[in-house]
Design a protein with these regions (language model features):
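Basic, Lys/Arg-enriched alpha-helical interface segments
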Residues: 1-64, 71-78, 82-96
Length: 96
């Protein structure tokens, strides 16, 4: 998959160093993936949630969430939000 918005990952890691290793692992694994469907995403991470309009919520360690739009045909993952669980709870992830 090609991931768009690495800048968001880099900036979040600077603010939240505890998430750094997990975000790097997520990024590297997704970059190597070739997802064709939600089932493939679920095989990667069985806790991922589909929230509509191509948006998926990934748990990054215990306290961090990443919302990305996944487009299977062109093999694109567009990061829309990275935040703490508290920030995630205050965000309408269906519109980010």
């Amino acid at each position: 998959m090609r991931i768009i918005s690495y800048r968001a990952v880099r900036e979040f890691k600077q603010k939240h160093p505890l998430a750094s290793v997990a975000l790097d692992r997520w990024y590297e694994t997704v970059a190597e993936a070739e997802w064709a469907s939600f089932l493939d995403v679920r095989l990667f991470d069985n806790s991922v949630d589909y929230v509509g309009d191509n948006r998926y919520v990934f748990n990054i360690t215990r306290n961090f969430r990443l919302v990305a739009m996944v487009f299977f045909a062109p093999q694109l993952v567009y990061i829309r939000f990275i935040g703490t669980h508290t920030e995630y709870d205050r965000t309408d992830v269906t519109t980010v």
